[in-house]
Amino acid sequence: MESFEVSSIDLKVFGKWDTKVEIRDPSLKKYIGLMPVYLPHTGGRHEHRRFGKAKLPIVERLINNVMRPGRNKGKKMLAYNIVKTAFDIIALKTGQNPIQVLVKAIENSAPREEVTRIMYGGIVYYVAVDVAPQRRVDLALRHLVMGAKEASFNNPKPIEEALAEEIIAAASNDPKSFAIRKKEEIERIALSSR
């Protein structure tokens, strides 16, 4: 029987995409999981560990966000196939590694500043605060998926195509992207309440 070393096996996401990508934002490096996995499905092993979701592959976190309440709630295989098809579309349209495009989209659409409510003596103040890196990634993924769902709802365009277009638009910092618009809105509100 042959023995294989784990390091010698070249794992790629969906059997196609390499996870050796560049993260330019230093604050997000720890929170964008790029470990090589063939099937991004950990089954909630991170659930009870503090900052456990930071170790989750970023593709799986995208899949989990596609499963948000609504039509796709709890249907992980459907979400998996949506993301897989969206990645194929991204590769066809851009000619780049879709994981690199996704990471760039997350970097561009992650808000840096937001508003929090502070109650002081019965009066509510809105104060601008910096966003934690983990929350930046969470918000970016959520807004990317929300934009895709909004674009494909009551529309003949399939969600796979909408998700691919949203990720490509966010990666190129296009103001037509829902995630970029949402980020700018959050930062504008934070700027006004400094």
Curated annotation (Swiss-Prot):
Pfam families membership: Ribosomal_S7
What is one GO biological process annotated to this record? translation
- Note the InterPro entries from the entry: Ribosomal_uS7, Ribosomal_uS7_arc, Ribosomal_uS7_CS, Ribosomal_uS7_dom, Ribosomal_uS7_dom_sf, Ribosomal_uS7_euk/arc
Q: Name one GO cellular component term.
A: small ribosomal subunit
Entries under Gene3D superfamilies matching the protein: Ribosomal protein S7 domain
Q: Recorded GO terms, molecular function? A: rRNA binding; structural constituent of ribosome
Q: PROSITE patterns this protein is in? A: RIBOSOMAL_S7
Ordered alphabetically, the record's keywords are: Ribonucleoprotein, Ribosomal protein, RNA-binding, rRNA-binding
Assembly with partners or alone: Part of the 30S ribosomal subunit.
Main function: One of the primary rRNA binding proteins, it binds directly to 16S rRNA where it nucleates assembly of the head domain of the 30S subunit. Is located at the subunit interface close to the decoding center.
Database matches in HAMAP family: Ribosomal_uS7_A
Quote the PANTHER family the UniProt record gives: RIBOSOMAL PROTEIN S7
NCBIfam families in the cross-refs = PRK04027.1, uS7_euk_arch
Similarity field: Belongs to the universal ribosomal protein uS7 family.
Per its record, how is this protein called by name? Small ribosomal subunit protein uS7
Give the gene that encodes this protein: rps7
